[in-house]
């Protein structure tokens, strides 16, 4: 019984070489065809400014000029696409400026979006009945936490939205989302 390993390795046959070339060609062609499809399906990373700030956009991803929001009557809650595309309420103040605090339209119970009810002066979640005060604090559960807030600034005619990292003015504590 010969337990020795053959010294010579078998050479690649013509058939194996052609199979390898065919497989490599198919793989390269498929990769070249799928790359543009992948780029189309995956949203590009949004460019952010200092501190993660972005420009407020509409539902189509177009920048919203500050003059458009400020033309609304005082106490209007304008819904824009904010950080990471999250729907965010901007509030027009009595002096026709924007409040420096924006509210993210995302219920802290199960993540539903909700409308502002001007008659009751509350945000009311239709999913499970949570209610929020105009500043985003919880009026009635089951929501366990106040709404996430963001910083809002107007520079020239652009609305900048950036993450809120300071003390939460509603609770006096570190924000729960930081």
From Swiss-Prot:
GO biological process: photosynthesis
Record keywords, A-Z: 2Fe-2S, Disulfide bond, Electron transport, Iron, Iron-sulfur, Membrane, Metal-binding, Thylakoid, Translocase, Transmembrane, Transmembrane helix, Transport
Cofactor(s) of this protein: [2Fe-2S] cluster
Positions annotated to bind [2Fe-2S] cluster: 107, 109, 125, 128
MF GO annotations: 2 iron, 2 sulfur cluster binding; electron transporter, transferring electrons within cytochrome b6/f complex of photosystem II activity; metal ion binding; monooxygenase activity; oxidoreductase activity, acting on paired donors, with incorporation or reduction of molecular oxygen; plastoquinol--plastocyanin reductase activity
Main location: membrane
One Pfam family here: TM_PetC
Sequence ranges assigned to domain Rieske in this UniProt record: 65-161
Reaction equations catalysed: 2 oxidized [plastocyanin] + a plastoquinol + 2 H(+)(in) = 2 reduced [plastocyanin] + a plastoquinone + 4 H(+)(out)
Gene3D superfamilies: Rieske [2Fe-2S] iron-sulphur domain, Single helix bin
Transmembrane regions listed in the UniProt entry: 20-42
Entry membrane topology: Single-pass membrane protein
Cofactor binding comment, as recorded: Binds 1 [2Fe-2S] cluster per subunit.
A Gene Ontology term for the protein's cellular component: plasma membrane-derived thylakoid membrane
Cysteine pairs bridged by disulfides in the record: 112-127
EC number: 7.1.1.6
Further remark: The Rieske iron-sulfur protein is a high potential 2Fe-2S protein.
Family to which this protein belongs: Belongs to the Rieske iron-sulfur protein family.
PANTHER family named among the record's database cross-references: CYTOCHROME B-C1 COMPLEX SUBUNIT RIESKE, MITOCHONDRIAL
Complex formation: The 4 large subunits of the cytochrome b6-f complex are cytochrome b6, subunit IV (17 kDa polypeptide, PetD), cytochrome f and the Rieske protein, while the 4 small subunits are PetG, PetL, PetM and PetN. The complex functions as a dimer.
Descriptive protein name: Cytochrome b6-f complex iron-sulfur subunit 3
Organism lineage string: Bacteria, Bacillati, Cyanobacteriota, Cyanophyceae, Nostocales
Name of the encoding gene: petC3
């Amino acid at each position: 019984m010969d337990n020795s390993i053959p010294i010579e390795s078998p050479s690649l046959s013509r058939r194996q070489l052609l199979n390898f070339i065919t497989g490599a060609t198919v793989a390269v062609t498929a990769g070249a065809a799928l790359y543009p499809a992948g780029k189309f399906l995956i949203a590009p990373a949004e460019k952010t400014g200092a501190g993660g700030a972005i420009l407020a956009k509409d539902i189509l991803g177009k920048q919203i000029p500050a003059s458009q929001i400020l033309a609304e009557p005082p106490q209007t809650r304008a819904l824009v696409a904010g950080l990471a595309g999250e729907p965010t309420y901007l509030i027009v103040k009595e002096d026709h400026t924007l409040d420096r605090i924006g509210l993210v339209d995302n219920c802290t119970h199960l993540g539903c979006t909700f409308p502002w009810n001007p008659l009751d002066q509350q945000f009311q979640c239709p999913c499970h009945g949570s209610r929020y005060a105009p500043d985003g604090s919880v009026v009635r559960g089951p929501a366990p936490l106040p709404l996430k807030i963001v910083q809002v600034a107007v520079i020239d005619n652009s609305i900048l939205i950036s993450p809120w990292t300071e003390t939460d003015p509603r609770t006096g504590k570190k924000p729960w989302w930081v």
